[in-house]
């Protein structure tokens, strides 16, 4: 997705490879919602081309960093700034007001090529995790690319001045970064996905390829075989591998190795070679558009979803999104990229003329209230979690576990532990008034995307979640509360996918052995779109809800399970949905503030309902 790099040893098949990578990214984003590996191909190609260019420049003794960075800025910045400016303007007109602060913040980060660090920070922020994907979220990869363009020439220059072996240095960078990627993906996958250190090896892989590929002359038939193997392997990568929850890590070797195979195969000269297809005029032209296509497709997709108020695009909608993105990409290439590339503008002047007004505009974009046709202004806690008046300390079992004790007047009559992720946190709004009335002490142990289980339910193999759960269970057994409040079910994805995972039941058995009662609540429905976004665009209309039969099975999944005797179940589905529908509003209260969390305002309105239900399953 990096802009094409001018090179005297131009290889037409690389433009076709860019085109394939861009199409994979777009198609997977629009219809499949999965990682395709296309971005990793862009990283490898950039490493290959830039390293080759730098090595040739140093060999001639003509490595001018100022000129190099200026050329790179003229290739990368114009289209990026145009898309950011257009996105900011369109967002102010069409996005729900609640999305403006996030959009402005990320536009600034993207303009400064720091979006990956913004998203990495959000991935470790308990509250930021629940924000909807912004219209410029895809700039994370461009930010890493920009950082690469800034730092890589310095690395090559230092290695040259110190007369070290570039091959050995790149091997060390490759191994260290790949090792970091594998480790951090296992420990904290959301952070690993956006972290620069976990991606540098992909550029180093391309750099290593640039150093050795010219030394290897493959027989034609081997080149044909290698090229097609790489291309076909790339096309099926996202389908064969469930890469989303374990990426980048070692799985990123698949798309990068496939792309490396295509590059190593080179121009075979065979009419049966993959390079002949990739070097065809349509794919080369699409390769020229690949950077702009990548820039445009995501804001067009997000804008479509917001305006339609749904979470899926369908076949016709997807074709429309891709077509619109291609038209915008072609226009940007013709009217922005090419004129700027041919101009004599200095990169410094261009940045000053565009970046400063863009950042200033993003800073002043703030919500000013509901727009015409939107829902009435909502209270703050209708769009967020309820605050919890508590004092937190680190668990004696682990510094990773925060235990938050609700404040009470005098000795508590009961101690109740809430343990799990945000879907348990939302019940604080209902339980806090009960605790205040009855003199209970609420004790919260919460971790985003980490339900109370013996397994990592949402991110397979997440060691941080596994450790946190083990420590939480040990802390609960030490505390011996009157009962534990946790989830009974979870949705694997949108639709009738609700399950009671075996890991939940195993934790209940562990507490049963310690004679600690468990109250397990059925999870609320998960939508394919943000209910709040839909309401703010379209108002409280039925399209912002969903038929109950599409979200909730008539019988909860735990009904026929063999569970320990210490477990009691609660199900508030009839208060979140009517008999036939799960509407956006019940009465005049917004039910959900995103696609899967109940608003604090609505949850607080259920406090007496929750209290009566608890009386039925616990000692009053």
Predicted features by range, described:
Residues 1-344, 357-359:
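Membrane-interface helix/loop caps of multi-pass membrane proteins
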Residues 243, 306-334, 338-620:
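Extracellular/periplasmic envelope-modification machinery, especially enzymes
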């Amino acid at each position: 997705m990096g802009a094409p790099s001018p090179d005297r040893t131009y290889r037409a098949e690389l433009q076709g490879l860019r085109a394939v990578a861009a199409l994979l990214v777009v198609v997977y984003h629009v219809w499949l919602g999965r990682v395709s590996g296309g971005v990793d191909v862009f990283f490898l190609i950039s490493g290959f081309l830039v390293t080759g260019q730098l090595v040739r420049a140093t060999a001639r003794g003509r490595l001018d960093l100022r000129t190099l960075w200026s050329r790179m800025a003229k290739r990368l910045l114009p289209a990026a700034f145009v898309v950011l400016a257009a996105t900011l303007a369109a967002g102010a007109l069409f996005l729900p007001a609640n999305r403006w602060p996030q959009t402005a913040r990320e536009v600034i980060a993207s303009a400064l090529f720091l979006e990956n660090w913004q998203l990495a920070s959000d991935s470790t922020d308990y509250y930021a995790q629940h924000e909807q994907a912004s219209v410029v979220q895809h700039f994370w990869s461009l930010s890493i690319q920009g950082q690469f363009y800034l730092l890589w020439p310095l690395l090559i220059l230092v290695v040259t001045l110190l007369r070290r072996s570039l091959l050995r240095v790149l091997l060390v960078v490759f191994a260290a970064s790949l090792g970091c990627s594998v480790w951090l993906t296992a420990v904290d996958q959301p952070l690993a996905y956006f972290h620069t250190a976990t991606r540098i090896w992909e550029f180093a892989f391309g750099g290593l390829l640039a150093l050795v590929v010219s030394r290897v002359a493959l027989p034609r038939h081997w080149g044909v075989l290698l090229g097609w193997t790489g291309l076909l392997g790339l096309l099926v990568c996202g389908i064969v591998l469930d890469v989303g929850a374990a990426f980048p890590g070692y799985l990123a070797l698949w798309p990068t190795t496939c792309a490396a195979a295509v590059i190593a195969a080179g121009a075979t000269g065979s009419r049966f070679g993959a390079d002949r297809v990739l070097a065809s005029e349509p794919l080369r032209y699409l390769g020229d558009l690949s950077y702009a296509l990548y820039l445009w497709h995501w804001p067009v997709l997000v804008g479509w979803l917001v305006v339609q108020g749904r979470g899926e695009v369908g076949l016709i909608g997807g074709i429309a999104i891709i077509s619109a993105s291609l038209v915008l990409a072609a226009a940007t290439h013709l009217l922005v990229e090419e004129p700027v590339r041919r101009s004599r503008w200095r990169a410094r002047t261009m940045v000053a003329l565009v970046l400063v007004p863009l950042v200033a505009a993003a800073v002043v974009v703030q919500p000013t209230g509901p727009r015409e046709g939107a829902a009435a202004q909502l209270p703050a806690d209708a769009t967020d979690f309820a605050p919890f008046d508590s004092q937190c300390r680190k668990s004696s079992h682990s510094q990773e576990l925060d235990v938050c004790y609700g404040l009470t007047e005098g000795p508590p009559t009961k101690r109740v532990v809430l343990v799990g992720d945000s879907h348990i946190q939302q019940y604080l709004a209902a339980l806090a008034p009960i605790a205040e009335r009855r003199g209970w002490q609420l004790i919260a142990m919460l971790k985003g995307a980490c339900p109370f289980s013996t397994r990592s339910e949402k991110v397979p193999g997440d060691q941080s979640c596994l450790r946190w759960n083990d420590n939480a269970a040990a802390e609960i057994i030490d505390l011996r509360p009157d009962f534990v409040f946790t989830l009974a079910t979870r949705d694997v994805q949108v639709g009738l996918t609700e399950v009671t995972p075996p890991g939940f039941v195993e934790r209940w058995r562990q507490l049963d052995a310690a004679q600690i009662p468990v109250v397990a609540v059925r999870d609320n429905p998960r939508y394919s779109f943000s209910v709040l976004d839909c309401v703010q665009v379209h108002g409280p209309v039925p399209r912002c809800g969903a038929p109950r039969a599409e979200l909730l099975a008539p019988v909860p999944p735990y009904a026929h399970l063999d569970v320990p005797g210490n477990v009691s179940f609660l199900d508030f589905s009839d208060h979140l949905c009517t008999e036939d529908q799960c509407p956006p509003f019940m009465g005049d209260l917004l039910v959900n503030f995103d696609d899967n969390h109940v608003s604090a305002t609505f949850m607080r309105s259920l406090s007496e309902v929750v209290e009566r239900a608890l009386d039925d399953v616990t000692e009053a």
